[in-house]
Amino acid sequence: MPILKERKWELIRSFQHHDKDTGSPEVQIAILTERINKLTEHMKQNKKDLHSRRGLIAMVNKRKALLDYLKRKNYQKYLEVSEKLNLRVKN
C-alpha cells in the first residue's frame, strides 16, 4: 500500500533536520511507520495475503533496526520519535 506523495512529504518535513534531509533515521522511521500502519489495515481485510504479510514483517524488522540504531546514537531523539509516532518504548 503506497502512501500519498503529499503525506510522505508531510512526514519528512516534520522529522527532517534541514531542508534537504530525507534519509535521516528519524525520517525513515516515520515513513516506515506510515507504511506499516497502512499495510496493517490491509492485512485486517485480507488475512490470506501472505506476500503482503512477508513485506509487513520485513518493514517492522527494518524499523526496529533503525530504532535500535537511533537509541544507541541519540537516546533523547529516540524518545521524541517514539512519542511522536505513538510507538511503545522498552526501557
From Swiss-Prot:
InterPro entries with a match to the protein in the record: Ribosomal_uS15, Ribosomal_uS15_bac-type, uS15_NS1_RNA-bd_sf
Keyword Ribonucleoprotein among UniProt keywords: yes
Pfam families the UniProt entry points to: Ribosomal_S15
Keywords: Ribonucleoprotein, Ribosomal protein, RNA-binding, rRNA-binding
Keyword Cell cycle among UniProt keywords: no
GO biological process: translation
Annotated GO CC locations: cytosolic small ribosomal subunit
GO molecular function: rRNA binding; structural constituent of ribosome
Disulphide bonds in the chain: none
Record-stated family: Belongs to the universal ribosomal protein uS15 family.
UniProt function note: One of the primary rRNA binding proteins, it binds directly to 16S rRNA where it helps nucleate assembly of the platform of the 30S subunit by binding and bridging several RNA helices of the 16S rRNA.
UniProt xrefs under PANTHER family: RIBOSOMAL PROTEIN S15, BACTERIAL AND ORGANELLAR (PTHR23321), SMALL RIBOSOMAL SUBUNIT PROTEIN US15M (PTHR23321:SF26)
Record's subunit section: Part of the 30S ribosomal subunit. Forms a bridge to the 50S subunit in the 70S ribosome, contacting the 23S rRNA.
Name listed for the protein in its UniProt record: Small ribosomal subunit protein uS15
Organism: Hydrogenobaculum sp. (strain Y04AAS1)
